[in-house]
């Protein structure tokens, strides 16, 4: 069974997780710390401060990588009960959740170095299995296996948009893609091959996602997100925005939560802090929304303090379970999430 409390049973999760170093002497003698950028534990674990938690963990999947990291000094990508950046969390989870998706932080790694993968004897996700198939086996023990994958090979693995599209089409009935300001549903990989994914601001991320093109969004955008028995404690709303950096800096997001008992929270303002550039004048704005189990609906809108209109090309709402898109009254529904542009 899944041990959800494996970390919470220790007074100090790190030091009490470090096991007998001597049992790893043979393996440690084969590991040159200078060759490795990081350790990636599989199954991947993440228990951070933003509630985007994974719990498919057994004790060995934490204690073995922690022990080897402690002895070698190689940093570990997994997160256990620490303050975490939401953007970094998205990147980390993307590495193991969706095969062939672009992971920004890996681009800073040296092509000549390697990632040390430590696999415990526990079931892996499809994304983890796909990643592992590109790695080389170093050592196989009773409780764990060591693999290595060169950063150059990892970058090539991440830069295969056609394979990413194929994977997404295998898990969805259709894929909604955006190019040159127009969106279309596709259901055949041959149609995907004709599209230039490198020029598309709408990249599929770690979640099962969709995108909406707003034909005439106007100066401001308002969304109303109703919920019905949500499966997750966190969702992510993303805005792909085309704007000059000055106009973007003067724009704020305002959101208001309404709970199932009809309690209406005061609106909250937020400067667009979670922003990254994706192309010339294209920006990705992320708004994480936590504790959605309590929500009946969520309203989000932009407020500008400049006269220049902010062109919002499309909007994504992501969750780790489902996404539903509404475009001009046409509803594509998966599970219990959906969203609509409110008048």
Question: Can you say where each PLM-predicted feature lies in the sequence?
Answer:
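Luminal/periplasmic acceptor-recognition loop/helix of membrane-associated glycosyltransferases
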Residues: 19-22, 57-120
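Extra-cytoplasmic beta-strand recognition segments
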Residues: 75, 168, 173-176, 181-183, ...
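Aromatic/acidic, Gly/Pro-rich catalytic loop(s) in extracytoplasmic/lumenal soluble domains
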Residues: 109-204
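Short carbohydrate-recognition loop motifs
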Residues: 193-221
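Beta-strand acidic-aromatic groove motif in beta-rich domains, primarily in extracellular
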Residues: 246-258, 298
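Extracellular carbohydrate recognition and processing domains
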Residues: 262-295, 307
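Short beta-strand-plus-loop segments that form exposed binding edges in beta-rich domains
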Residues: 300-308
């Amino acid at each position: 069974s899944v041990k959800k409390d494996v970390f919470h049973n220790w007074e100090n999760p790190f030091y009490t997780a470090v096991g007998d170093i001597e049992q790893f002497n043979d393996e440690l003698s084969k590991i040159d710390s200078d060759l490795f950028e990081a350790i990636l534990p599989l199954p991947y674990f993440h228990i951070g401060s933003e509630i985007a938690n994974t719990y498919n963990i057994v004790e060995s999947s934490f204690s073995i990588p922690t022990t080897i990291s402690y002895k070698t000094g190689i940093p570990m990508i997994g997160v256990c009960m620490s303050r975490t950046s939401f953007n970094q969390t998205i990147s980390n989870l993307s590495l193991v959740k969706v095969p062939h998706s672009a992971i920004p932080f890996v681009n800073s790694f040296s092509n000549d170095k390697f990632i040390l993968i430590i696999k415990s004897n526990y079931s892996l996700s499809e994304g983890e299995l796909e990643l592992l198939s590109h790695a080389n086996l170093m050592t196989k023990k009773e409780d764990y296996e060591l693999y290595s994958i060169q950063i150059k090979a990892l970058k090539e693995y991440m830069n295969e948009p056609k394979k990413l599209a194929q994977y997404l089409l295998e898990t969805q009935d259709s894929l909604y893609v955006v190019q040159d300001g127009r969106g279309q549903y596709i259901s055949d990989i041959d149609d995907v091959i004709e599209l230039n994914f490198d020029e598309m601001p709408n990249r599929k991320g770690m979640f099962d996602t969709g995108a909406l093109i707003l034909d005439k969004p106007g100066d401001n955008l308002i969304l109303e997100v109703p919920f019905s028995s949500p499966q997750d404690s966190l969702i992510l709303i993303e805005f792909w925005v085309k704007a000059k950096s000055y106009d973007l800096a003067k724009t704020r997001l305002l959101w208001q939560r309404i709970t199932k008992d009809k309690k209406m929270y005061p609106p909250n303002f937020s400067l667009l802090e979670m922003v990254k550039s994706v192309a010339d004048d294209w920006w990705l704005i992320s708004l994480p929304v936590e504790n959605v189990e309590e929500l009946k609906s969520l309203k989000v809108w932009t407020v500008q303090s400049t006269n220049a209109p902010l062109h919002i090309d499309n909007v994504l709402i992501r969750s780790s379970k489902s996404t539903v898109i509404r475009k001009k009254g046409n509803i594509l529904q998966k599970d219990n999430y959906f969203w609509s542009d409110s008048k």
